[in-house]
Amino acid sequence: MKTRLVKHPCPEATIAGAAARVPAAIIAAVLLGITASPARADCNPAERINASCYSNLQDATTAAIAANQPLWLPAGTYVLNRELVIDYAPLAATGFQIISDGAIIDATATGNRAMSIECSGGSPQDAKGCFYFHIQGTLFVNANSAQAAVRFGFNDFSDAHNSAKIDHLIVNNAGPGYAVRLNYNLNADIFAVAVSAGSAGLVMDQVQFSRISGAASATRGTAMRIERGYSFANTIQAIDLEVAQIGLAITSPYANRNTFVSPYFNCPTAILATAGNSNMLLNPSYGAGQPPAPGSQTGVLTLP
């Protein structure tokens, strides 16, 4: 996973070159083979791990989790050669934070998923409870994959992510897969722009009492899907669903009492709901196609 950055390069100093800039104690530590602090202050910021000071993003992530410190992504492009796995199980009780200054994670060349946020150690019968994952700032993620570009939680629901917060996540999957897939997220607050050239932009699989906003599109598919597991008591607000054949599809029989506040649909087919109960659209707007006829969509109520 090679990192290519626009800013904050790390020094590659020899011991002789370092002598002019660092104390003798650090030089002695280097000569003794002991790991010393980097000479540049921006490669050793207080209380955070600077990803630009590592040869690859996976190593930086592992170091941040081990140190129980936020992972800082300075502005720049981080090119992956394999999937970035963020397994914050060691911090399941207190959470893990990523601070992004408009960084771009680019997995386009791999053909695989770009990023998986997970919490190992559970099972489908006994999911591991994990808390307080947070992406602060704006983070861009690019992929070209048949998988979801960003997956939050294992597909088998073996990790339950509680009280996550994602400030501003922009995901673009140029392949046939999903852009963003949410698996077993509870009491989350997520703003995502989920764009796919393929089957679905934003997919909610077992999401409960969470707040979701942003935008979703899928050129050859469905902008937003609620399709597996128990998804209920969610508020989806100020969301833009467009550039897709279908705006919203609800196929899970356990999708109940979700409220869409002022959603905007700009797709040939705005809504296709075949399952669920008491899912409400409050004050929806339609930019293309016709609003669904009253009573034509299973479990969907519209006001006004």
Each language-model region and where it sits:
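N-terminal secretory signal peptides that target proteins for export/translocation
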Residues: M1-A20
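Bacterial N-terminal signal peptides
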Residues: R21-T35
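N-terminal extracellular ligand-recognition/capping segment immediately after the signal peptide
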Residues: Y54-Q58, T62, A67-Q97, D101-G111, ...
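Residue-level detector of bioactive/disordered segments in secreted/extracellular proteins
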Residues: E12, N44-P45, S55, G121, ...
